[in-house]
């Protein structure tokens, strides 16, 4: 909330850091390893790296249990195939937080795993969705044989639902704090 209020004072566009600072950072802090904290958190907090959230899919919308994007283990890596939609800011993000299906043979909520990935990885294709206004804040993101190391997994394999709940709990605070920033901004301008 404080970060959003300060950004608003200096006309930083609303929402640019909400996913990284408000959702990815708390998830990394809760579920990440010390090396994740050292490498990613400083650049998240400083705004040097922008993050997006890769959760919603065309067939299931925001119903995570219905997602179809899959990851298959190959040695020390995972191969990701599938599609996400309505991804805010993917076209300018450096990293993304991603929930995928790693086990199709168990209950839907139990077959999920949670990763983060470099949005410039080979096989990641980002297509902005043009709005009526001409802008494109949302994107479709396609994954074709995207290889990511197991070290970019948060939580255990099959624990993606629990990790995603951490993200979603913080999403409410991040979005709510954005409104507080706007209110502070208006107070300064009045």
Regions found by a protein language model. Name each.
Residues 69-72:
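A structural signal for short hydrophobic beta-strand segments in well-ordered beta-sheet cores
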Residues 1-48, 88-95, 171, 183:
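Internal helix-loop-helix
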Residues 81-127:
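A short core secondary-structure module
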Residues 60-61, 85-90, 132-133:
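Glycine-rich phosphate/pyrophosphate-binding beta-alpha loops
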